[in-house]
């Protein structure tokens, strides 16, 4: 998997935050991941929004939201949906999860490595919404309701 990440200004952050090593305000967030079709997805200077789902319930919530929106919403908003499947057994990933994701009309950037997952701020049962401007993190919020995600994508 192609993966490159640049996050700046980590100094003492790790000891002060339960998501040690996770992006924070002012950090530069540039990375390349693979999607459900094994195509490269770039979080770059043009990306405005990253929506991160760290588990099954948050992924289901994201799917529900995106099913109710036009399939081009993520692309139109310069948003990237990132799903963490690092905790999933490889057999389930290969035989069930990826084929199911491949049926979706939108792109899903996939994290398969737990170390990559730790680069994203997380709260239990919440979608992490990271706003970016020119590759820099300008806002991090955690949402649990469909309406909150839909609002972020407007």
Q: What residues fall within each predicted segment?
A:
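Solvent-exposed loop/turn segments at secondary-structure junctions
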Residues: 56-58, 85-89, 114-116, 137-138
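Short active-site neighborhood of thiol/selenol oxidoreductases, capturing the structured segment around
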Residues: 42-59
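Structural microenvironment flanking redox-active thiols in thiol-disulfide oxidoreductases
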Residues: 58-99
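Short, internal strand/loop/helix patches
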Residues: 80-82, 97-122
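Bacterial N-terminal signal peptides
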Residues: 1-12
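Thiol/disulfide oxidoreductase modules built on the thioredoxin-like
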Residues: 43-45, 112-149
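N-proximal helix/coil linker or "cap" segments that precede and/or mark the start of modular domains
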Residues: 10-28
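A short beta-strand-turn-helix
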Residues: 30-47
């Amino acid at each position: 998997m192609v993966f490159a990440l640049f996050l700046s200004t980590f100094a003492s952050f790790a000891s002060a935050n339960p998501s040690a090593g996770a992006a924070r305000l002012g950090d530069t967030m540039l990375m390349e991941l693979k999607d459900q079709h094994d195509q490269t997805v770039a979080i770059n200077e043009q990306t405005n929004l990253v929506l991160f789902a760290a588990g099954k319930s948050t992924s289901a919530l994201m799917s529900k939201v995106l099913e109710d929106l036009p399939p081009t919403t993520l692309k139109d908003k310069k948003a990237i949906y990132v799903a963490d499947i690092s905790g999933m057994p490889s057999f389930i990933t290969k035989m069930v999860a990826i084929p199911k994701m491949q049926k979706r009309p939108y792109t899903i950037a996939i994290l398969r490595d737990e170390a990559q997952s730790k680069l994203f701020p997380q709260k239990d049962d919440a979608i992490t919404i990271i706003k970016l401007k020119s590759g820099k993190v300008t806002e991090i919020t955690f949402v649990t309701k469909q309406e909150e995600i839909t609002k972020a994508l407007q």
